[in-house]
Design a protein with these regions (language model features):
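Conserved HGGG/HGGXW glycine-rich cap/lid loop of the alpha/beta-hydrolase fold
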Residues: 7-80
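Conserved acidic catalytic loop of the alpha/beta-hydrolase fold
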Residues: 93-110
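Conserved hydrolase catalytic core segment
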Residues: 109-148
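Flexible "cap/lid" loop of the alpha/beta hydrolase fold
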Residues: 137-166
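Conserved alpha/beta-hydrolase catalytic His-Asp/Glu region
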Residues: 170-212
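Short beta-strand/loop motif that positions the catalytic acidic residue
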Residues: 230, 236-238
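Acidic catalytic loop of the alpha/beta-hydrolase fold
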Residues: 241-245
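Catalytic active-site module of serine/aspartate enzymes centered on a nucleophile-bearing elbow/loop
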Residues: 260-297
Length: 297
């Protein structure tokens, strides 16, 4: 299994490295510091060794190569929606290779892999490419790549792809973006927002990286048929009020992967809100340990 084109990702670890490893993959253009630290601590308290890498083109990880113009991105989205093939500087499978290289670097032979949004798509590609190294898969607020459900609703997609203008406070712009797709009533404190912006600013051209990541999503295509051949214990968690990726996208993954478990959370949007940290941490940790028991049988 080759990962010759993989990039070395920046990462942080939490907990005891002798415990079962859980790799958490963040979403589109977002640095790993966006994983709420109290949520990570809950996973550590439940006996997991948590690894949070920055995906390529995010945070402190290397930037990808290739320029994608806004015009090219627009026409690529149209081609994808119509069922056409898209070429890109890299694919989600290439991003999965980055994760496998990180596992090699950390000496992790097998890991539980979880991801939110785009990170959940990368996690699927890790499992599809390296089932023998994937102890379990957790898909949070994500999709299978089916153009009918997996691109996102245009209004919400526009909100996350539109950069702030010169007159807009970046902190207020980020808050409004998160509120546009997140759980109604969820708040984001200034320290958290500042930390995310500071980490994102480590990329010389964050918007160029976001466009490359979207192109990677488009180029990967529809994974539904491949997911039907997946034999990795899979948990799908999806907000029932997700304004970006409809809950049907999560149900579609669960329907494709045999033996998977679907957990819909009423009122939750496209985020991991404070009010559901414990519920999600409990579900993820339980899934990891159930999967480990199944593997030993």
């Amino acid at each position: 299994m080759s990962t010759s084109g993989a990039l070395s990702l920046s990462y942080k670890t939490y907990g005891d490295p002798h415990l079962p490893p859980l790799i958490l993959l963040m979403g589109l253009g977002t640095p790993s510091v966006a994983w709420p630290r109290p949520f990570i601590d809950m996973l550590v308290q439940r006996g997991l060794y948590v690894v949070t890498p920055d995906n390529r083109d995010a945070g402190a990880s290397p930037a990808g190569k290739g320029l994608v113009t806004s015009r090219e991105l627009f026409f690529s989205i149209m081609r994808y929606v119509l069922g056409g093939r898209v070429t890109a500087p890299y694919t989600l499978t290439d991003m999965a290779d980055d994760v496998l290289l990180l596992m090699d670097t950390l000496g992790i032979r097998r890991a539980h892999v979880a991801g939110v949004s785009l990170g959940g798509m990368i996690a699927q590609c890790v499992a599809l490419k390296a089932q023998h190294r994937t102890l379990s898969l957790t898909c949070l607020s994500t999709a299978s790549g089916n153009p009918r459900t997996g691109l996102g609703k245009m209004k919400a997609l526009k909100a996350i792809l539109t950069p702030p203008d010169a007159q807009t406070d970046p902190r207020e712009h980020l808050k409004k973006t998160m509120q546009a797709v997140g759980t109604p009533g969820e708040t984001y404190d200034d320290d958290f927002v500042t930390a995310v912006l500071k980490a994102a600013a480590q990329q010389k051209n964050p918007q160029a990286g976001v466009r490359r990541q979207v192109m990677a999503l488009l180029a990967e295509g529809n994974r539904t048929a491949k997911l039907r051949q997946l034999f990795v214990p899979t948990l799908v968690i999806h907000g029932e009020s997700d304004p970006l990726l409809p809950v049907a996208a999560g149900k579609e993954i669960a329907a494709a992967v045999r033996g998977s478990t679907f957990v819909g959370i009423p009122g939750m949007g496209h985020d991991i809100p404070k009010m559901h940290w414990k519920k999600i941490a409990d579900a993820v940790a339980r899934h990891c340990y159930d999967a480990a028991r199944e593997t030993r049988l």
